[in-house]
Design a protein with these regions (language model features):
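Phosphate/dinucleotide-binding and metal-coordinating scaffold of catalytic cores
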Residues: 1-299
Length: 299
């Protein structure tokens, strides 16, 4: 159960049913016990990290706010609970929020060329508020990260497909696909990847299984790290992995990914680009994602 205090801080309590049969959705921040948890003001604007992971940021936040404006709603008037309700059942991982005020999600195969052009229009103009806004919102407006992206269904699987951002090279999709193949050759666990229409990078969603969802939490969400700042290093991730999984094989996954990021000069390896996934009644280091050479100070 979720509520807001008079200071606009998130209050959370596990239900009796979940206490009897569930697991901690965020072991360091929300251990599985009775009682009310109150969030800190920072770094998640009065929320808990595990719920902040479900909210759109970057591109997704841009799309949501313009979608709201297009429909006569001032985004500045929404509370944290309002925004979680807009995520509803469409967010990353297994968490769902009630009341569910999310828009109906389109999962059918998309016209990628048209969407890529609409993404360029949206990014090129602060005032663009055309139909492309609703199209992206209907196709999964909640994904995080800076690059335009959608969710789609193809070949019986759910995929995340990315488009080029303003500063990206024209072959960014081909580049990310090649690095995903290289990562797999290096023994790094990744979901299936492919190029749609020979230029749009797609990755199968690892938080979705047949007729179900898997719970996922980023390192930022787990330990309350501000991913916008260079606030953690790999030692923190090793410690989180050891504490959650108690499994040396999982720690080796972190090590391989650390070395790979260093060798490809990926400086976008911030706290939201690592995650843990709960499956088979245990925690595991999540498959890798966002593997590209990148500049930045927040890695």
């Amino acid at each position: 159960r979720l509520a807001l205090t008079k200071e606009s801080l998130c209050a959370f309590e596990y239900s009796t049913e979940w206490l009897n049969s569930g697991f901690s959705i965020s072991p360091f921040e929300l251990p599985l016990r009775s009682g009310v948890f109150i969030a800190k003001p920072r770094p998640f604007d009065g929320g808990f990290g595990v719920f902040d992971d479900c909210l759109p940021d970057g591109w997704g936040l841009l799309i949501l706010d313009r979608y709201l404006q297009r429909n006569g709603v001032n985004p500045q008037t929404l509370s944290l609970l309002d925004r979680l309700a807009l995520v509803g059942s469409t967010g990353r991982g297994a968490l769902e929020f009630r009341p569910d005020k999310s828009v109906v999600s389109k999962q059918e195969y998309a016209d990628f060329e048209k969407l890529a052009l609409e993404a360029e229009q949206i990014l090129d103009s602060d005032n663009y508020n055309g139909e492309g806004i609703e199209e992206f919102q209907y196709r999964g407006g909640s994904p995080g990260g800076a690059r335009p992206k959608i969710f789609t269904r193809y070949d019986g699987k759910e995929w995340l497909v990315k488009f080029r951002a303003k500063r990206d090279s024209k072959q960014i999709g081909e580049d990310e696909y090649c690095y995903s193949l290289l990562a797999k050759e290096c023994g790094i666990e990744m979901p299936e990847t492919r190029l749609f229409e020979d230029k749009y990078f797609g990755v199968e969603r690892f938080d979705r299984i047949l007729n179900g969802k898997l719970h996922v939490v980023s390192v930022a969400g787990l330990i309350g790290a501000d991913y916008r700042l260079p606030s953690i290093d790999y030692l923190h991730i090793f410690k989180v992995c050891a504490a959650l999984t108690h499994n040396v094989a999982e720690i080796w996954k972190v090590y391989r990914l650390m070395v790979f990021n260093y060798l490809i000069d990926n400086k976008d390896d911030h706290a939201k680009n690592f995650a843990f996934i709960y499956r088979d009644d245990d925690w595991h280091f999540a498959p890798a994602y966002d593997l590209l050479p990148s500049d930045g100070i927040n890695g």
